[in-house]
């Protein structure tokens, strides 16, 4: 076994310091036996530790460096690397790790043919030698968690968008139904105002007429009744005129009869009139006839006759 050399490569020294640091055990640490180290969280390791020690954040470059110094990947389902001279508590063995001169030459510390894969993206899960995805016992990677969160948020947004579309369609249907109801009410009010206004005009000329479904009824009957009233008034007027003429003739006859009964003695004319109940009634009728329009003309006719 080679003795430790003073010129141990800085890559090995820095890697050993990271593995030994207890504050980074959640990201990188020894395995249970101390014969290999495990990178538990490659994403955080590349983001936080590599820039601090190696001035870069490329996890694939770190893996290629391990392959150059003869490290091999022990377990397929996690990033666990081992070298015979890289052990817990035995830092002096680091001098025995030699850098390979070329990919075709082998040495004591050369990596086997199925060595560490170098071009492995950080976001991809570890794969076995057969190329199939391997089940990892390490904590979930940050990128995978972010992708899962984004997928969940997108699904929630799509569901919310669909719900809002359904709600919008329902409100549009309710608005259309409310508009139809409003239009119907407006038409009914307009029709009522039109019919009610016509009924009032007709009522001003005659009697109030009943309405049936917005249409006035009884108009013909009212006109017939008005005609009958006019005929009755004409007949009553004719009857009254005939009665007045008869009364006047009776009065004249009674006056002549009374004049024959008045005796004339010694040049003095004395006129006596016997009034009966019939005469009183006749005089009352004459007074009433005189009070009517045209009554004065009838009185004058009576006086002349």
UniProtKB/Swiss-Prot annotation:
Annotated localization: Cytoplasm; Nucleus
Residue stretches of biased makeup (Acidic residues): 226-253
Region (Hydrophobic repeat HR-A/B): 164-193
UniProt xrefs under SMART domains: HSF
Basic and acidic residues: bias regions: 263-274
Region Disordered, residue ranges: 97-144, 192-278
GO CC annotation terms, alphabetical: cytoplasm; nucleus
Coiled-coil region(s): 147-187
Ranges annotated as biased composition (Low complexity): 110-131
Record-linked InterPro entries: HSF_DNA-bd (IPR000232), WH-like_DNA-bd_sf (IPR036388), WH_DNA-bd_sf (IPR036390)
Highest taxon in the source lineage: Eukaryota
Motif Nuclear export signal: positions: 275-285
Modification note: Exhibits temperature-dependent phosphorylation.
Intervals of motif Nuclear localization signal: 268-271
GO MF term set: DNA-binding transcription factor activity; sequence-specific DNA binding
GO biological process, one term: regulation of transcription by RNA polymerase II
UniProtKB keywords: Coiled coil, Cytoplasm, DNA-binding, Nucleus, Phosphoprotein, Stress response, Transcription, Transcription regulation
Family as reported in the entry's similarity comment: Belongs to the HSF family. Class B subfamily.
UniProt subunit comment: Homotrimer.
Domain free text: The hydrophobic-rich region (HR-A/B) corresponds to the oligomerization domain.
Function noted in UniProt: Transcriptional regulator that specifically binds DNA of heat shock promoter elements (HSE).
Protein's name according to its UniProt entry: Heat stress transcription factor B-2a
Native source organism of the sequence: Oryza sativa subsp. japonica
Gene: HSFB2A
